[in-house]
Amino acid sequence: MRIDKCNGGDKLKTKDGRMAVYLGIAYSKEQLFTIAIFPGNNNYYITECNCHGIVDGFPSDEIIGYWED
């Protein structure tokens, strides 16, 4: 099920203006999320499902699986 229109590698911004790169869609036990990585940080972060911008979410240990769009 496609839940957004982001493309892999899309440049996205956090609310505080930091850039991130869209990687795909992740899922936790509760919900589907988009997933992005922040430059200079090797951790993945789950983010809210929208393509207009992303907010900081849970660290990667909350992710139980992900796939590329």
Predicted regions located by residue number:
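Short acidic/polar mixed-charge low-complexity motifs
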Residues: 16-19, 42-43
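SH3/SH3-like beta-barrel fold
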Residues: 35-38
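Mixed-charge, Lys/Arg-rich low-complexity intrinsically disordered regions
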Residues: 1-8
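Tryptophan-anchored aromatic micro-motifs
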Residues: 11-14
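Repeated polar recognition positions within modular binding domains
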Residues: 30-32
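Short beta-strand-centered aromatic/proline hotspots
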Residues: 18-28
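Intrinsically disordered, low-complexity, charged/polar segments
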Residues: 40-69
